[in-house]
């Protein structure tokens, strides 16, 4: 009887192990993992496509991406409510200090390159602006296109909301930290600005190149540092990557500490397989040297 009992127990154990193995096989062999990510609206479409493609290759790992602006994503990372923040600007020192005080060491990854596009209505005859002229438009110095060699038509400036990384980058780079004109129309996202410019002959706005390149009904202006300097388009990939285009910038992902496990796989994938997708969405892939530097942060 004792031998029969032992045999019966052994059979039960074998069937149990087999059942567990079968369940693991059916489920992909790994426990489902969810990565939460939030931040830049400029990067929202890019990050959503990255998340979808990554999940296609790593079925057990899901990445939930939402927008709200770079500042919103960074705040969420500091509070520990997301695993990753996408940002179209670098973290400010005050934000880094807040993170460290909260016990979080933010790690920065450059993941793509953007050239902020200055867009106007297709009927606007202006083709080129200098950085000073652009600053004058957004600080309220210029209020009519005729002052810039254009038509006698009021200028309507469109920009982003204050939580946007692009809002802050533009204020630092173009306005030299001056205030925006109080007449600027603050819009919720890049698509809203594109739509506004399509319907406003006097309008001017700034959007990520990933949005401008795919839009119709708008014109993308060339920019120059000053009047004697050459002007460049954000559609000129070499000019953006080399920094000749004056509004070139990196796009970032931030993690709380050096990523491990599934999060490390996600960052590794973005810096390798994800780079061609950045080009497909309309942004620019990182140069090889920059990729090597970012990959070293995962070692």
Located regions from the model:
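Exported/periplasmic ABC-transporter solute-binding proteins
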Residues: 5-9, 16-18, 23-299
